[in-house]
Curated annotation (Swiss-Prot):
Pathway: Porphyrin-containing compound metabolism; protoporphyrin-IX biosynthesis; 5-aminolevulinate from L-glutamyl-tRNA(Glu): step 2/2. NCBIfam families: hemL, PRK00062.1. The modification N6-(pyridoxal phosphate)lysine is found at K268. Belongs to the class-III pyridoxal-phosphate-dependent aminotransferase family. HemL subfamily. It comes from the Bacteria. This is Glutamate-1-semialdehyde 2,1-aminomutase 2. It is found in: Cytoplasm. Transmembrane segments: none annotated. It catalyses: (S)-4-amino-5-oxopentanoate = 5-aminolevulinate. It comes from Bacillus licheniformis (strain ATCC 14580 / DSM 13 / JCM 2505 / CCUG 7422 / NBRC 12200 / NCIMB 9375 / NCTC 10341 / NRRL NRS-1264 / Gibson 46).
Length: 431
């Protein structure tokens, strides 16, 4: 059994100065019934806590670190950029360079605006959709999390699901009434919504692979159906690729599935571990944003040189071969853990998309929020604690996915499988 005494003391101190002792709710580890583990440093696929424990990290700062921790080239470029200045409040060529790289790789994006977070990206995209169409209603999907903007905290996933909340107090009814929620992967319900509200719907926002109720890929025809419905009714299709962008595929989820939205929201990977977000799409829509158009959006640190530098270096290192390797390693991890669970009589369902992996303690299939919630959360908490003691750091929530990086080795994968075997054996014996 590992010692977490320093983390325990650090958490007690943190609770005196921060709400719940953390700056994002899922970091409180409430759903796994333990105190949060405080981290000190990371290198490659490994992360180290303040008690000196080492872990193979499958959280990767909730997705951004696709090259692993402290990638030497990324760190070097950030250091060089910082020496020139951390922020100017004026344009830099770095912004243009990253924008050109994003436009080159993301099928839907002709023009892109940089912001400082994924939440900013989705909020700004919704304002743009409303301003462009002259309509007010937005459709989202149950269990999909698009940041903490008021109009999107309706039946959200991620940390909201982890805390067992349907939505958040503080969201005015006047805002909530313009958000329509539909079960994920349910195209028939979408057709009914458009039959009733089609002329009032500004846009449909969707995670092309849901990543905030665990990992839940789209069923066949779902994304294609959304594209057809929105085009028919003059609404915008918005892909929230903050998580899936450059994780599912070299050309993002839209490239992988062959469905092109009107607007795309990005974040995480494109900042290489620094705060960033972006939204982009067709030129005729994006040109409505100030200063070229009347729809306002601004940000003090948008496009700051450190985030642009980290994002540029990260994307430059990713190649189509990177994604083939992700798939190979994810296949092995899924097969090994599935076999270990089956051997010990533990129900386990895997979902996967590129370097995103989700597994649920249920017999499945898991295709939406309702089926995701059927997972045995008590069993997940047992598994989580056991894997932490075995030196494997997982997301402390059933409703979050695992991430792979280019730094994960075959030895890391085998160590993780062996750890899962031991943990499942202990759980099986105790039941």
């Amino acid at each position: 059994m590992r010692s977490y005494e320093k983390s325990k003391a650090a958490f007690e101190e943190a609770q005196r100065v921060m709400p719940g002792g953390v700056n994002s709710p899922v970091r409180a580890f409430k759903s796994v019934n333990m105190d949060p583990i405080f981290m000190e440093r990371g290198k490659g696929s490994k992360i180290y806590d303040i008690d000196g424990n080492e872990y193979i990290d499958y959280v990767l700062s909730w997705g951004p670190l696709i090259l692993g921790h402290s990638n030497e080239k990324v760190v070097k470029e950030i250091q060089k950029a910082a020496e020139h200045g951390t922020s100017f409040g004026a344009p830099t060529e770095l912004e243009t360079e990253l924008a050109e790289l994003v436009i080159d790789r993301v099928p839907s994006i002709e023009i892109v605006r940089m912001v400082s977070s994924g939440t900013e990206a989705t909020m700004s995209a919704l304002r743009l959709a409303r301003g462009y169409t002259g309509r007010n209603k937005i459709v989202k999907f149950e269990g999909c999390y698009h940041g903490h903007g008021d109009s999107l905290l309706i039946k959200a996933g991620s940390g909201v699901a982890t805390l067992g909340l349907p939505d958040s107090p503080g969201v005015p009814e006047s805002i909530a009434k313009n958000t329509i929620t539909v079960p994920y992967n349910d195209l028939e319900s979408m057709k009914l919504v458009f039959q009733e509200f089609g002329d009032d719907i500004a846009g449909v926002i969707v995670e092309p692979v849901a990543g905030n109720m665990g990992v839940v890929p789209p069923v066949k025809g779902f994304l294609e159906g959304l594209r057809e419905l929105t085009e028919t009714h003059g609404a915008l299709l918005i892909f929230d690729e903050v998580m899936t962008g450059f994780r599912v595929d070299y050309n993002c989820a839209q490239g992988y599935f062959g469905v092109t939205p009107d607007l795309t929201c990005l974040g995480k990977v494109i900042g290489g571990g620094l705060p960033v977000g972006a939204y982009g799409g067709k030129a005729e829509i994006m040109e409505k944003i100030a200063p070229s158009g009347p729809i306002y959006q601004a940000g003090t640190l948008s496009g700051n040189p450190l985030a642009m530098t980290a994002g540029l270096e990260t994307l430059k290192q990713l190649t189509p071969e990177s994604y083939r390797e992700f798939s190979r390693k994810a296949d092995r991890l899924e097969k090994g853990i599935s076999e270990a669970a089956e051997k010990n009589g533990i129900p386990c369902t895997f979902n996967r998309a590129g370097s995103m992996i989700g597994f649920f303690f249920t017999n499945g299939p898991v295709i939406n929020y309702d089926t995701a919630k059927q997972s045995d959360l008590g069993l997940f908490a047992e598994y989580y604690k056991g894997m932490a003691d075995e030196g494997v750091f997982l997301p402390p929530s059933q409703f979050e996915g695992l991430f792979l990086s280019t730094a994960h080795t075959d030895d890391d994968i085998e160590h993780t499988i062996k750890a899962a075997e031991r943990v499942f054996e202990r759980i099986s014996r105790s039941r």
